[in-house]
Regions:
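Structured loops at beta-to-helix junctions and adjacent beta-edge loops in soluble globular domains
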Residues: 169, 203, 229-231
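Short hydrophobic/aromatic beta-strand micro-patches
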Residues: 105, 227-229
């Protein structure tokens, strides 16, 4: 977002998501979408999805959510107002670090015509004999154009074998993530009570600033990614880390 996409003419306005008014302030006339994560990397911070969805839709732009850390087992963003959901399938969906891949899920709910900001979907496409994707594909216009043009032009597709491997991982996603959460909570609680640990960042803890959102959006747990700070800072951390290089 910060360094690669600007080379293709796409710029990003970054905001502090802890204050929802920042989203409202950042939206400009040429803003095409709001992009957030269900669980932030690396502190697993949580954003009020429904509130951000309302802001995006008021400005007639879609809400795109990266649900890589959340996974479909823990949260389904479309049920909370997301229009498009993306995943890095390499992480929890695949589960074994064996393949590179990604997923795009189109809710089919966003009105691309009413938005007036997406001529690629509403105007004739000369590379497909003048087809208008909103007419040819209806609610699936967005994801259809991705498959018909962007996949064709960029080659951003995985091999059949890698797709097969990712599907094998998908079959056990719920079982694996359930265990991930169970194990993570044990470690989080252990570290949170450790005398040499200054702070643990995980929304399951009652003192985490997003704990209320955790209870609202993540009844099955908020993933297994967390960070912690040790007393003594960097010097103490390096003392323990360097012997294990």
């Amino acid at each position: 977002l910060a360094h690669t996409l600007p080379n293709y003419g796409v710029t990003t306005t970054f905001v502090d998501p802890s204050d929802l008014s920042n989203f409202e302030k950042a939206i400009q006339e040429n803003t095409k979408a709001v992009f957030i994560e269900t669980l932030g990397n690396p502190n697993s911070n949580i954003i009020d999805i429904e509130a951000v969805s309302e802001i995006a839709h008021r400005h007639k732009i879609p809400l795109i959510i990266d649900n890589t850390f959340g996974t479909p087992y823990l949260i389904r963003p479309i049920e909370h107002g997301a229009d498009i959901v993306v995943h890095s399938a390499t992480k929890f969906i695949g589960g074994h670090g064996s393949s590179l891949g990604g997923v795009i899920v189109d809710s089919g709910k966003f009105d691309w015509v009413a938005s007036g900001k997406f001529p690629q979907l509403t105007e004739p496409d000369p590379s497909y004999h003048g087809v208008r994707f909103v007419d040819a594909a209806g609610p699936a216009a967005y994801v259809t154009r991705i498959r018909a043009t962007l996949l064709r032009d960029t080659g951003a597709t995985i091999s059949p074998f890698n797709a097969f491997i990712l599907l094998q991982g998908l079959e056990t996603l719920s079982l694996r993530v359930e265990r991930h959460v169970e194990n993570a909570l044990k470690v989080v609680n252990f570290l949170n009570n450790h005398p040499k640990v200054k702070k643990v960042n995980h929304p399951s803890l009652s003192d985490h600033p997003d704990h209320a959102l955790y209870q609202r959006y993540f009844p099955n747990g908020a993933g297994s990614i967390f960070t912690f700070e040790v007393k003594g800072g960097q010097a103490v951390s390096y003392t323990h880390l360097r012997p294990h290089e």
